[in-house]
Amino acid sequence: MTSERIRVAILFGGRSAEHDVSRASAANIFRSLDAGRYALTLIGITHDGRWVLADAVNDATSAALIVPADGPQIVLLPAGRGRALAIDGSAAAPRELAFDVIFPVLHGPNGEDGTVQGALELADVAYVGGRVLGSAAAMDKDVAKRLLRDAGLPIVPFVTMTAASPVSYDDAARAVGSSELFVKPANLGSSVGISKTRDAAEFEAACQLALRFDRKILIERCIAPVREIECAVLEHADGQIKASELGEIVPANSHGFYSYEAKYTDANGAALHVPAQVEPAVAQRIRKMATEVFGALCCESLARVDFFVRGDEIYVNEVNTLPGFTNISMYPKMWEAAGLPQPALMDELVAHALARHARLRELASQR
């Protein structure tokens, strides 16, 4: 690794319905990484999956980074320890690049689910975030909930279905013990494709919507009214795992729940409270449970754990291993409330990536 600035490549965009959220998250991370400490390269992933050099079309003033439609394509070399080629399609020889750390700012399938993490493992380069197993386990809400249930952690009752194995409204309602249901894609975040249903007609429409985004969908009991409480978890370079201050999301009555529109298109879609006003004993239980969830799903580096709280009842809702870093995102806000501003948070994430990669390289690969 260079003795000067640490070479960091920010990977953003991606083949996911959360492509635009990734672009906004990446813009904030780009601004938060100290240019005096890090040499930054921007790599956008197009909707069709091409990795494209994006430095020329972006700067630190962008609200959301741009993924260029064309430009030099980036090829990360297997076992290259961060070496890459920029290929511009001309007869000229490819330009050689090198990175110490990859920062994947990717949300949803083909980015947060272990696929990109697998490519980075094969490239033998340090990277921010969970590894393949933790990323994949947390991404699939069905698998995650089963692992959490087996670990003795409280979850909301649910069933799953696919287009090939449909479930009727009556059977789903009977299975989870409620006529009011949430239907959601199993492998997507940012509330994309989620619906609240109260009868068979709404349920059928909700299933069709969710199946547009995923081959497997989750059907959960609606336990409203609840408070939506979140906790950020961070693993430091030495392996210590810490939980942040808590945050609360209060969706506007006009939305009914924290939908995609409430998050990203309606400025008044929800009120965000950091720190959340929670009884100290309940807050302590939530923070402890967040670190237990982190361990049960084999998470590393960072995660945001979302809870439903009703009185003294606490349920794990879901886990995001690459949480949003937009200007409204809770993960950086909760750490800031805990005394860790975003630039320092970036330093912690990069330091963990480098330390983990060094530890992994010490493991024997031959007998």
Swiss-Prot record:
Binding residue positions for Mg(2+) 2: E318, N320
Protein residues bound to ATP: 174-229
UniProtKB keywords: ATP-binding, Cell shape, Cell wall biogenesis/degradation, Cytoplasm, Ligase, Magnesium, Manganese, Metal-binding, Nucleotide-binding, Peptidoglycan synthesis
Leader sequence segment: none
Cofactor binding comment, as recorded: Binds 2 magnesium or manganese ions per subunit.
Pathway: Cell wall biogenesis; peptidoglycan biosynthesis
Subcellular location(s) per record: Cytoplasm
Domain of life: Bacteria
Binding site for Mg(2+) 1: D306, E318
E.C. designation(s): 6.3.2.4
Domain ATP-grasp: 145-351
InterPro entries membership: ATP-grasp (IPR011761), ATP_grasp_subdomain_1 (IPR013815), D-Ala_lig_Van_CS (IPR000291), D_ala_D_ala (IPR005905), Dala_Dala_lig_C (IPR011095), Dala_Dala_lig_N (IPR011127), PreATP-grasp_dom_sf (IPR016185)
Catalysis: reaction(s): 2 D-alanine + ATP = D-alanyl-D-alanine + ADP + phosphate + H(+)
GO MF assignments: ATP binding; D-alanine-D-alanine ligase activity; metal ion binding
Cofactor: Mg(2+); Mn(2+)
A biological process term (GO) from this entry: peptidoglycan biosynthetic process
Main location as per UniProt: cytoplasm
Any one GO CC term of the record: cytosol
Keyword Membrane: no
Enzyme class: ligase
Pfam family, one: Dala_Dala_lig_C
Entry-linked NCBIfam families: D_ala_D_alaTIGR, PRK01966.1-4
Role of this protein: Cell wall formation.
HAMAP family assigned to the protein according to its UniProt record, in alphabetical order: Dala_Dala_lig
Name of the featured protein: D-alanine--D-alanine ligase
Origin species: Bradyrhizobium sp. (strain ORS 278)
